[in-house]
Amino acid sequence: FRRVLFRSTIPALIAGVLLKHIVEGLFKKPFLEAGIRLLTAAALMTLAEYFGKRTRSLSGMTWFDALIVGLMQILAVFPGASRSGSTISAGMLCGFDRPSAARFAFLMSIPVMLAASTYELLDVIKMHNLGSFLPLLAIGFVTAAIVGWLSIKWLLNYLTRNSLYSF
């Protein structure tokens, strides 16, 4: 399973590096860009609910399934894109049930988020007055980790009983 998980993260890691300058330019029109991505996520989730077979679990995941879900994770590098929405939808379109698709989507986010955070941390370390910001950065990091964990836990529980239509 670790190999499949690793393979699923490769597309987003490559896209993050190659598209960095293009994506930074998109933040000049954030409302338009975010609107386009939110509508795309809504369409993907609707298609996943309508066409997804939802009969498979993570134990049946192949490298090809992981690649498909990983390719959808590329959308997350663009402003306003829902990483979880696009990857959960891709998992469901590959035939996975909602909870399995969501679990995989969140597991595959860990390596990508760690890589992106490490990359951004290199810029933070170069700050002249870093010492004065460290307490705020630490509070922000801990708060984000706790809220993220609680949100994922809630969403996994929600998706065992409900569809993606409400999103």
Q: What are these language model-derived features?
A:
Residues 1-166:
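Multi-pass membrane proteins that catalyze or facilitate reactions on polyprenyl-/lipid-phosphate substrates
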